Amino acid sequence: MIEIENTFFTLAENCQRNCLVICDRGAMDASAFVPKKDWEYIMAKNGMNPVGLRDTRYNHIIHMVTAAKGAEAFYTLEVKSRSYGSYNSGTRQLLSAYLEGDHLARSESLPAAQMLDDRAAEAWIGHPYFDVIDNSTEFDTKLRRMISSVCQKMGIDTGDRLAIGAKKVKFLVRSLPDDSKFPKFQDFEVVHEYLKASVRNTQPRLRRRGQNGHWSYTYTVRRPKINGQQVEVKTQVTQRDYNLLLGQKDDKHFTIHKTRRCFLHNNQYFQLDIYREPCHPRCKGLLLLETYTTIEGKQLMKRLPEFLDIVEEVTDNPKYSMYNLSLKEEWEITKHFCHKLEGPVDELGNPVLINGVSNVVLEPEHLNEALSKI
């Protein structure tokens, strides 16, 4: 499977046009169906590790929740009976599945399908860009949610064609409960560095994210909002490129250190950021919970983990923006506090340069070219 994927990845990298490689299942899925010791042996024998297989191999993970969880009426093992003339039984079954939509690959009972779905989802806990698409909507809307999620991660503006109200929400948490209160989780060490920018209302930054000595590196450009949605274009970079880009570090900001705890709860993927020292006093003991959802108000509050003491929602509160939290100067005196990342943009949503200032923010599509000249 990995060799087949590598072939397609290489073809895509060598293509002169933009390519999107979509994998039906990924390397970590196998870990859900073999004993943990066996999986660790397989990885060790092949020189692999979870960060490489789970976090850096794929840019985005989407888990489509089985119909057995939330859409049970549409989960069936039976092939409907209809006459297809003199075709043999195998052909009749294929025709039935093709014309009537039954799923020939299903063999699990409802409880078994639910259990296997949980295992498959848990295999990807910890991936930095992991979306769970549940069955809270009709199937067509479920597909639109999936497509919209991909477009959002790629920085593609879909206008209102796929508008379904999903957004990132953030909550302030009062205190960290004992680990035993959490469902299965993965902890990561995360380090953020803000970079210098000469383009108004853009925020370039680097991220180093790792576990057990294995690291992934990401370059992000945060742009002004498009149609009310914040746009962040992310690109994976190598360790060498990361070190080169650190030369652009913005001295107005502290380095941000976090432990990021990733877990699933109620078919919802959550990330709990636990801020660590060294940091500005404003960040000491800070706990922020994030998730992407279409739910709002009281219904959303009911979906939040009951084992966490939620203080309030702080989604659009600039006091809890990582950009502002990392500022070295006190907020009362600094000129760099960002109240809202908005500004003039062109018809494509790109920031308009102010007074002819040249753009020194490295856009992801030009990143490799720029790094090759350093």
Where does each model-flagged region fall?
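ATP-dependent NMP and nucleoside kinases share a basic, alpha-helical "lid"
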Residues: F9, N14, C23-M115, R119, ...
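Short active-site-adjacent structural elements
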Residues: A71-A73, K142, Q299-M301
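Structural motif
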Residues: L20, N59-I61, L286-L288
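Phosphate-binding beta-loop-alpha motif at adenosine-nucleotide cofactor sites
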Residues: H127-M146
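Phosphate-end processing signature that detects enzymes handling 5′-triphosphorylated RNA
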Residues: S148-I374
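Long, hydrophilic "mature protein body" segments
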Residues: Q93, A113, D118, H127, ...
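Short, structured active-site "lid" loops
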Residues: M1-C19
